[in-house]
């Protein structure tokens, strides 16, 4: 195995840790981003586990830049025993945290917000470098973390239980929220910072410690975030395991999911893995919060403002190269405006190249709007999906599809519009790539039926100017998703509302709204301040 000497934070980031690994020099592009966060630029091994101490002696994970294929970092992950140790440390830390008054936890959260705020641009660039989303989206993702810290700080003084009237004289009923203990956070590659942020902020403010297993392909984002949080915890006399980190792959994830010392597992990822995770957590009667795949539709009705719809669809279908859980994958067009709207879309899609308005290229270049897919495996899934649609009789409507050469290697593909056959399986599955499937409808009822006729239930949007259609869309006969928008695209939610989806998207809610209520154990407490012992419902039990 690899010889690892740990890297204390105070050491210069470029220090050579292991002669076997410290032989490479990075591109100036990657070095600039990593140095801004004090991450090594010489290929030395980076400890990928933190439970108060940095360490890790599991397998080495390579972080690969999706835009260039360059190895930008090597991370020594946690092994199974170390994961168990970290879980125990997190459990111990939860006892200290739950004793801390909520508003004091709020003050710690405010300081975390400041630490993140000071590095928003640098961290955003790391998201772009490691995940591949464009610069403004990388920064936007960190901003979401900052925003949820603000929200959580406020929540620290307002998380309210309830006082309820009792039917018995001189009795009162309270509903009381208390911390759960340990929240395990398993996150997906496509939001390597924000998803953790939503969970950390709400879990911590409600008095829980956390243990985070990030995606195996975005360990550097996780390490950088944890390094920003670490000094804040230390300054406030809190153990590091209040926000533990275990980089690793499936085995590490399974340790967390299966551990009865992890009171709640907040899992963000695919439906396939989420189903497994949900069953394992259920089997031990733990709590699971599942945020799984989406298959999101936009409906453009005959009375829609087409220019607005166009902007929204392009951002949600092409943005993040189709790699948001909320990306638009299905587009239902009223027959009367369909041809016009498709030609408006194609004007943009067919102009997309490294030279034109919908510019594809280095996500770190401010002018780029289309970045790469995250891995070469994702390119293959994109290609297979397109081949399958065409084999089954569907058509590609865009001039170009397939791999795109922007002159820097990487996993770039052409955003593609397709017209699959009506019964094509692509309508009901999430392909995590910029493929937009189009079909027509004649009535709003039919469009709503099409929107709802898939297993997933994350996000849906209706473009209309008709108030009756709006009412229908939002009501009991309307869209069945967790996010139901009008004249706003399917992606780009704000943190104020609860975020999550229904059906096979997992029914979880994170972030704002009432999401915090899932991170606590609720007790209903009836208190008798009389000198009698009456029973509820007038029951008489003559003693
Ligand atoms: P994924 O399911 O492949 O992996 C998610 C996480 O699970 C990773 O950390 C992975 O290492 C871990 N994992 C894999 N097998 C495991 C197991 N058996 N036990 C425990 N952990 C295991 O997902 P991904 O490819 O990283 O992310 C893309 C998916 O995430 C898409 O389906 C997307 O829609 C979804 N997503 C959903 C939301 C949401 O809020 N609904 C947000 C972001 C992403």
Where do the model's predicted regions map?
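Short, well-ordered beta-strand elements within core beta-sheets of diverse protein domains
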Residues: 71-78, 93-99, 185, 298-301, ...
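ALDH superfamily catalytic-core signature
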Residues: 231, 272-422, 486, 535, ...
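Structural signal for hydrophobic packing residues in well-ordered secondary-structure cores
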Residues: 94, 98, 113-120, 124, ...
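Conserved C-terminal structural/oligomerization subdomain of aldehyde/semialdehyde dehydrogenase
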Residues: 26, 67-73, 237, 299, ...
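Residues at or immediately preceding the N-termini of alpha-helices
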Residues: 66, 80-83, 102, 120, ...
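N-terminal Rossmann-like NAD(P)+-binding subdomain of aldehyde/semialdehyde dehydrogenases
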Residues: 3-171, 351
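Residue-level signal for inorganic ion chemistry
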Residues: 69, 105, 127, 207, ...
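Rossmann-like NAD(P) dinucleotide-binding subdomain of oxidoreductase/dehydrogenase enzymes
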Residues: 161-308, 441
């Amino acid at each position: 195995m690899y010889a690892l000497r740990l890297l204390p934070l105070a050491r210069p980031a470029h220090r050579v840790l292991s002669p076997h690994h410290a032989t490479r020099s990075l591109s100036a592009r990657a070095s600039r981003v990593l140095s801004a966060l004090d991450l090594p630029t010489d290929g030395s091994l980076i400890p990928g586990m933190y439970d108060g101490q940095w360490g890790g002696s599991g397998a080495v994970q390579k972080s690969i830049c999706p835009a260039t294929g360059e190895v930008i970092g090597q991370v020594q992950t946690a092994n199974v025993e170390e994961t168990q140790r970290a879980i125990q440390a997190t459990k111990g830390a939860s006892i200290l945290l739950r004793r801390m008054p909520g508003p004091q936890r709020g003050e710690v959260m405010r300081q975390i917000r400041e630490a993140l705020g000071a590095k928003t641009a640098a961290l955003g660039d790391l998201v772009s470098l490691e995940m591949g989303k464009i610069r403004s989206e990388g920064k936007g993702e960190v901003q979401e973390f900052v925003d949820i810290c603000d929200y959580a700080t406020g929540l620290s003084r307002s998380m309210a239980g309830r006082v309820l009237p009792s039917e018995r004289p001189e009795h009162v009923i309270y509903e009381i929220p208390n911390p759960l203990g340990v929240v395990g956070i398993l996150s997906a590659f496509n939001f390597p910072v924000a998803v953790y942020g939503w969970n950390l902020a709400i879990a911590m403010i409600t008095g829980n410690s956390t243990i985070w297993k990030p995606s195996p392909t975005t360990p550097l984002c996780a390490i950088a975030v944890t390094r920003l949080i670490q000094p804040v915890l230390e300054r406030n006399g809190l153990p590091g395991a209040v926000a533990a980190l275990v980089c690793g792959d499936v085995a590490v994830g399974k340790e967390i999911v299966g551990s009865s010392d992890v009171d709640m597992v907040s899992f963000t990822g695919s439906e396939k893995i989420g189903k497994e995770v949900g069953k394992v957590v259920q089997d031990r009667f733990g709590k699971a919060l599942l945020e799984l795949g989406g298959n999101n539709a936009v409906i453009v009705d005959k009375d829609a403002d087409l220019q607005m719809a166009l902007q929204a669809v392009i951002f949600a279908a092409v943005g993040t190269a189709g790699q948001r859980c909320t990306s638009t994958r299905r587009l239902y067009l009223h027959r009367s405006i369909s041809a016009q709207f498709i030609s408006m879309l194609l004007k943009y899609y067919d102009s997309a190249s490294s030279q034109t308005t919908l510019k594809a290229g280095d996500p770190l270049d401010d002018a780029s709007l289309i970045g790469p897919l995250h891995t070469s495996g994702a390119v293959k899934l994109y290609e297979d999906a397109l081949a399958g649609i065409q084999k089954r009789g569907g058509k590609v409507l865009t001039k170009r599809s397939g791999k795109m050469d922007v002159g820097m290697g990487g996993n770039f593909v052409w955003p593609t519009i397709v017209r699959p056959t009506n019964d094509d399986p692509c309508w009901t599955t999430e392909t995590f790539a910029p493929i937009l499937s189009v079909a027509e409808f004649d009535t709003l009822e039919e469009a709503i039926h099409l929107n709802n006729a898939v297993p997933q239930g994350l996000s849906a949007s209706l473009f209309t100017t008709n108030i009756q259609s709006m009412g229908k869309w939002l009501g009991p006969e309307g869209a069945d998703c967790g996010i139901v928008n009008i004249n706003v695209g399917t992606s780009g939610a704000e943190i104020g509302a609860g975020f999550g989806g229904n059906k096979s998207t997992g029914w979880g809610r994170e972030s704002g709204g009432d999401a915090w209520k899932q991170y606590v154990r609720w007790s209903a407490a009836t208190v008798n301040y009389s000198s009698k012992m009456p029973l509820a419902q007038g029951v008489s039990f003559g003693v």
